[in-house]
Regions:
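Glycine-rich, low-complexity segments
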Residues: 1-56, 148-161
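Flexible, charged surface loops at secondary-structure boundaries
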Residues: 53-57, 87-90
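Short carbohydrate-recognition loop motifs
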Residues: 57-64
Length: 161
């Protein structure tokens, strides 16, 4: 593992390091991961039918306002940085999207990685065709990079009330 010391003497400073390390046969406990709570723009609102999920900024993305239309989820590393360039072959990332539904249920109807359509492997073997009304739908995804621009994407939808 390589860490770098940063000293700031004046002004404001935001530092968001990426530390890559290998842990083989080890035990990690009490990990804390970042969750983004979006209280203003739900999927489908104001024509927002494509959601860019930047995995470098959160492991969980929660929309607390009601979903108003089906949406496409685009998975990428960051604005201007592809997932393909961030992951090596054999690496994976797991992330979650939580949406709030009112009486009319909507769902994640399409998925892309770096803007390219991908067909996931769905838990239970059948693609979801609807969301769940008056509840939270939790979508869990694992993307495994198997070659350049090639992934296995595992996807699950779970209802919480």
């Amino acid at each position: 593992m390589e860490l770098t010391k940063v000293t700031v003497t004046t002004g404001a400073f935001n530092y968001s390091p990426i530390i890559k390390t290998a842990l083989v046969g080890g035990l990690a406990s009490s990990l804390i991961e970042t969750a983004t709570v979006n209280t203003t723009v739900a999927p489908g609102s104001t024509g927002n039918t494509t959601i860019n999920y930047d995995i470098n900024t959160q492991s969980v993305l929660y929309y607390s306002t009601n979903v108003t239309a089906n949406w496409t989820l685009n998975i990428r590393y960051a604005t201007g940085t592809s997932l393909n360039s961030a992951l090596a072959v054999g690496q994976s990332v797991t992330f979650v999207m939580i949406v709030t539904s009112a009486a009319t249920a909507y769902y994640n109807s399409a998925i892309t990685i770096d803007g390219v359509s991908i067909t996931p492997k769905y838990q239970g073997g059948t693609a979801w065709s609807a969301g769940n009304a008056s509840s939270w739908d939790v979508y869990t995804y694992t993307a495994i990079k198997t070659a350049a621009n090639t992934y296995i994407l595992l996807a699950a939808q779970t209802q919480f009330k």
